[in-house]
Amino acid sequence: GHPSRGVSPLFLHYDHTEVGDDPFGYIIENRVIRGGLSQLAGQLENLTVIAPASVETVERHADGADVMLEDGRVLQTSLVVGADGRNSPLRKSAGIGAREFRYDQTAIVCTVSHERAHAGIAVELFLPSGPFAMLPMTGQRTNIVWTECSDLAPAFVGLDDAGFLGEVQRRFGDWLGALELVGPRFTYPLGLMHADRYTGLRLALISEAAHAIHPIAGQGLNLGICDV
């Protein structure tokens, strides 16, 4: 497809019933996942949640590790697990390098409501500037992940609501009727990152502290969960 010409009539449809009864996957809102994990964490007797908290220093040695918090408390452990994101301070402090690649693309993310039901169907358009993903949410709402050239993304995000929604609608098409913005829009740069190694002395890196990929396949979170 192309924004100026609308949605292409060419498409590839994946039908999960051809391989089984279950859907290919589920889309769960971040706030729901975080809420569920927080609730579960409070029920586990062998887990202590310390929040809010910031780590001041981490000292790792042959016998274990000492983690000093900003408030002065020191936690002693046999293993430090770094799950502190693609710019992981733990990875850097351990001297573990990483290979990185910038795609010169920016993801513009927003949520829209629409007149017609999406029937739980996810759609991804492949446009010249990058994929435009429409991910079904609860009710008549859809999350948009619009990949755009980094040079152009600020101009689109800087439009007023009517102008921005018009650009979204041109790409989205009218298959779900008129759209309405729900909540804020935000952006993040897209890039690849892979740590040279995942472990160090009394240290293990997981999730985006170890590996980060392009969101086109929607597997970043899944890969992080698999690490656990």
Which ranges hold each PLM region?
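Short, conserved catalytic or interaction motifs in soluble domains
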Residues: 60, 114, 215-218
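Short Gly/Pro-enriched turn/cap motifs at secondary-structure boundaries
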Residues: 99-102, 122-126, 187, 195
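Central beta-strand plus flanking loop segment that forms part of the substrate or channel wall
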Residues: 87-122, 132, 140-142, 148-152, ...
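Conserved FAD/dinucleotide-binding core of flavoprotein oxidoreductases
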Residues: 127-190
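Conserved N-terminal helical subregion
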Residues: 1-93, 101-106, 161
